[in-house]
């Protein structure tokens, strides 16, 4: 017969093993079912181009990643970092929202926005330029803000916040290169670089009120809710509230957003790049793919609750 001492030791060992298993489960963020991965890969596999994405249910901690830690070109999503530096500068008392910025030929750049249609010499407040940068993705307004803040200051802010991958390399259209932008290895990124994972981390901190301060973070989220373009993540859910920023370059499309859906608050960052054709249309295949992926992510991450 098994001795009492042996039985006690076995029972103690089993108790420790059970406790360790319980702790491991408790400390591991919820992950989506394999069905979500199957749906995502079914969309991505036939797509002509490269796809990078990261998503997180901010209520449950459930995550999904596909190349989410790969560094990618940002296009206009880097404007989120510029916005954060502007709000921080004002909060620190080193800038005022009423500070005037002057529209010049050097700042002028087309592609999106309204300022390229207006005359040089126009004076706008810092507040106006930041609003234009985020709501209508005005490239000229962005350059005006960057001339005021500097690209190096934006990057220093990202470093201070712990974001090592998110960097702006230069002004839109060229000039104003940051220190990182002058590095040969970074030339391939053009305007800016980030990872989908890091963009979701930034969104999560903004939503939690942990960037600058709670009132400023809320104001930034509210500003992103006013973005007028819903070409990608919010394309097929027009009535669902969303705080977002999209971006477009030649063969690239990107979008980062917090979707305030019935499934919970889902933060999503998607970049598609190296598409075979340059298509300047709201029906760009990249936008269409992102809209389908967003629906799968919203439903799949909700199922992990």
Regions found by a protein language model. Name each.
Residues 61, 73-101, 268:
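Active-site SXXK
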Residues 27-43, 148, 200-237, 241, ...:
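Structured C-terminal helix/loop/strand segments within mature extracytoplasmic catalytic/sensor domains
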Residues 50, 122, 130, 143-203:
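Mid-domain, small-residue-enriched loop/turn segments at the edges of structured enzyme/sensor domains
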Residues 2-15:
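Bacterial N-terminal signal peptides that target proteins for export
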Residues 88-127, 131:
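Active-site-proximal loop and beta-strand segments within enzyme catalytic domains
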Residues 58, 97-114, 149-150, 171-176, ...:
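Acidic helix-start/capping segments at beta-turn-to-alpha-helix junctions
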């Amino acid at each position: 017969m098994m001795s009492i001492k042996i039985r006690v030791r076995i029972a103690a060992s089993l108790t420790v093993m059970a406790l360790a298993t319980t702790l491991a489960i408790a400390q591991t963020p919820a992950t989506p079912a394999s069905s979500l991965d199957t749906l995502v890969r079914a969309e991505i596999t036939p797509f002509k181009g490269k796809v990078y994405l990261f998503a997180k249910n901010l209520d449950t901690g459930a995550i999904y990643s596909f190349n989410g830690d790969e560094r990618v070109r940002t296009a206009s999503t880097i404007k989120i970092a510029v916005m954060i530096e502007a709000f921080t500068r004002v909060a620190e008392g080193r800038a005022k929202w009423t500070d005037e910025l002057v529209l010049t030929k050097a700042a002028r750049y087309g592609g999106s926005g309204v300022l390229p249609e207006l005359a040089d010499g126009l004076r706008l407040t810092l507040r106006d330029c930041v609003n234009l940068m985020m709501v209508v993705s005005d490239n000229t307004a962005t350059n005006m803000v960057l001339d005021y803040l500097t690209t190096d200051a934006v990057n220093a802010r990202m470093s201070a916040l712990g974001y090592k991958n998110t960097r702006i390399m230069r002004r839109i259209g060229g000039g104003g290169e940051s220190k990182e932008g002058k590095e040969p290895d970074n030339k391939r990124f053009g305007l800016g670089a980030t990872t989908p994972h890091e963009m979701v981390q930034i969104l999560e901190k903004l939503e939690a009120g942990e960037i600058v301060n709670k009132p400023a973070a809320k104001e930034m989220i509210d500003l992103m809710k006013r973005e007028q373009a819903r070409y990608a993540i919010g394309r097929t859910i027009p009535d669902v509230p969303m705080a977002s920023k999209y971006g477009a370059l030649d063969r690239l499309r990107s979008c980062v957003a917090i979707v305030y859906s019935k499934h919970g608050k889902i933060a999503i960052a998607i970049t598609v790049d190296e598409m075979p054709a340059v298509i300047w249309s709201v029906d760009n295949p990249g936008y269409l793919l992102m809209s389908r992926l967003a629906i799968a992510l919203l439903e799949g991450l909700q199922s992990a609750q």
